């Protein structure tokens, strides 16, 4: 089977969880099916308007696909920003369309108390309505979609990485630290984490906080760290490759992901897979695999004092931490093993292809 895959970022150069997810998924599926990935060639910052970037990106993807001169059996689109190309190519090539909804911009903006971009609302609806089958990574995401779409939704989580290679920790990192990583955007909840850490450090005086990633909120977080007198206790690192992330995970006291909106939680999955004591927020895709006091720690980061108390108690209880770390690792292998994920995708692709009236 030949799959035409559309994505806003290339799996070989991931810049977010979507790219990391694709990188892993394609590596597991490639021995069994042929996947050709098409991505935009332009850069968002070079466009005056977001709509112009999306329009040009989709036009470019369509042009590249049509000039590729290869027969495909199915289109798999990732993210609503590929919706115009996906919908057009479905009609032009007469192919069934599967779409993975990695998150909803409408829900993300609601959490941040901002108005979603009208163009994104349109592309979300276009992709959901055009797809013959929808894939989401968590039951949380399934609940987020309209009930009318539920009949064509399949929940398939992101596969575990199964990678163990680590590097050597820099001498400057030879200290006790909490670790969090991802995009520096409001919905990741890092402003709340800084507030919690400001309290926690008073009880854990040798503890540091390491934040790795990139995004528009970086300067805001740096100012917050200074306001809470944390400049010498918080270290900001750039976007890291997976090997460096595993290295830091292997040396941290715990990994903390306080997101206010999280469709799946790939970083938390990665942390648990590495056997790290993992703290997540109460909502989102975390809930499919993070069970409080069993496989992970679930905290309400809006209650700053209570969250600090909770983290402090687990940092001091080594035996309980050891039990949770091992259970978390086993949970990820049980629910997200690549064999399970690969089988689910192959079966879904086959079903979509066989059910299509146009193949």
Curated annotation (Swiss-Prot):
Matching Pfam families, A to Z?
Glyco_transf_4, Glycos_transf_1
Q: Name one GO biological process term.
A: biosynthetic process
Q: What is its EC number?
A: 2.4.-.-
Q: Which GO terms describe its molecular function?
A: glycosyltransferase activity
Keyword terms:
Glycosyltransferase, Transferase
| EC class of the enzyme, as a word | transferase
What protein family does this chain belong to? Belongs to the glycosyltransferase group 1 family. Glycosyltransferase 4 subfamily.
Q: Which PANTHER family match?
A: GLYCOSYLTRANSFERASE (PTHR12526), SPORE COAT PROTEIN SA (PTHR12526:SF638)
Name of the protein: Uncharacterized glycosyltransferase YqgM
